Every structure is written in structure tokens, then in C-alpha cells.
Amino acid sequence: MTTSNSPTPMHPVSIVSLGPGDPELITLKGLRRLREADRIYCPATSQPDGTLTSRAADILRALDIAPAIIRPFPVTMRDDRAAALADYSAAVRRIAVECAEGRRVAVTAEGDAGFYSSLGYISALLAERSIATEHIAGVPAFVACAASEGVVIAELTEETNILTTLSSADELLDRLAAGRSLVLMKPSRYASAVKEALAQAPADVAFHYFEHTGADATRAYYTCRRDEIATRRFPYFSLLIVRRE
């Protein structure tokens, strides 16, 4: 009887994009990879009592993924990214062990993993360890928001700018005057500029404002009325689509 000394095969890590939060918006391929996985790692936030909360884990449970294979890992949420990078490094060390033992591992991202997602750090750290990855696309939040209200983002040759920062109301108005439609991500960072533009923009400019769309039905909010938008606080999970109509 011979004994094989061949190494344990190492499967590529699946980076699975979950979409904006509605479990039904995950792709069929993404769901298949989750069901094939032996371990699923998902980012989580540490609470004051030491527990971890994870929107990604909530989505996985809604998809009937076995809780026993879900592995939340804490990610520090601060402007100083050093602590978060340390958290990603710790998660990758755990993932590398799982891979070396022959397990199929998936890592999840809300929205799309290649669109303003911190999972780029995970992919880079895995590459440094020569661990292959497979990226599976997801529905970005702004696409889900537009679909939820039948909003057109762009047509024909219209240019679209996706912004996460804005220097002033004038910058927003200048982009509109150049014939561009705008997707304003993370508007809490520049709320004053947006609200100033609300008061100055021509009447044919539509401001579509969304909160928690596709993620939390109890908190989801939409309006295209400028006076209502001006009163909102622009929470973290908010965005606007702005264009001439």
C-alpha cells in the first residue's frame, strides 16, 4: 500500500459581492459560491459590549447559509486606517490557514467588492501570500437605488460622474451645466455643499435622495423634493442621483 505525499489542494478564495443588502439581489453565481464554501468570512463591527454585528452576516443568514460556517471578523471604523489594516491582516492569516487545510473559503462584501469596498485590502494581502482569488460581481447601491424608484441615471451619450467628495456647490452646478449626471456617494462628508446646490440649481435639475435603500426596509427613505432633502441629516447609508430631466 502506498501513501500519497501530494500537498493538499488549495482552492481560490471567492470574493463574493452581496449587493446592497436585499438578499434577493445577490447573483446566482455568488449564491452558488456561498453554498459551496466551507467557511465564509464577513466584516463586522465591534460593539461596546464586545459583541460583533455584521450586515453581511445578516444577509447570509437570510440566504439560509448555515451559521456554523460564518466567520465574522472585526474591522475598526476610524479615519486612521492603520487599525483597520491590522484587522484585515489578522483575517487574512486565519483565511490562509483555512486554505492550507484544503477548505473552500469565501469572503463577502456589501455592494460590489470592486466599487469603494475595503475588500481590496483583503485581495492584496491574499495575493502577497500567493493565494488566488475569484471576484464575483454584485449590484452597487446606487444602481439598486435608481431601480427602486425607476430613476434613469444616464441616457445615450450622457456622461456620469460618481463622486465621494465635493469641494463646493459650484463644483456640483458646473458638472451639471456640462451635461453630466451625478451620483453622490457618502454625502454626509459634504452635506453643506449639496444643500447649498439644492437652493441654487435650476428647476429642471432633479435631486433624487435615498437612505438605506435595499438594505433596511424599515429605514428606507426616498424623496425628490428639495425642501425635504434639505432637512435630512445624510446618514452614512445615503446617496443622491442628480441630473437634468
What are these regions (language model features)?
Residues 111-178, 231, 245:
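Class I SAM-dependent methyltransferase SAM-binding "motif I" and its flanking Rossmann-like core
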Residues 2-24, 28-132, 220, 235-239, ...:
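Class I S-adenosyl-L-methionine
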Residues 76-81, 141-142, 168-170, 215-217:
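A short acidic, often aromatic-flanked loop/helix-cap motif at beta-alpha or helix-coil junctions
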Residues 84-91, 148-151, 175-179, 220-227:
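Short, surface-exposed amphipathic charged segments that create phosphate/polyanion-binding patches used
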Residues 13, 176-245:
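A contiguous loop/helix-start segment that scaffolds small-molecule binding in enzyme catalytic cores
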Residues 47-50, 140-143, 191-192, 215-217:
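Short gly/pro/ser/thr-enriched loop/turn and capping motifs at secondary-structure boundaries
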Residues 90-97, 152-164, 226-238:
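A polyampholytic, Gly/Pro-enriched intrinsically disordered region
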Residues 42, 71-72, 107-109, 135-138, ...:
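General beta-strand structural signal in soluble alpha/beta enzymes
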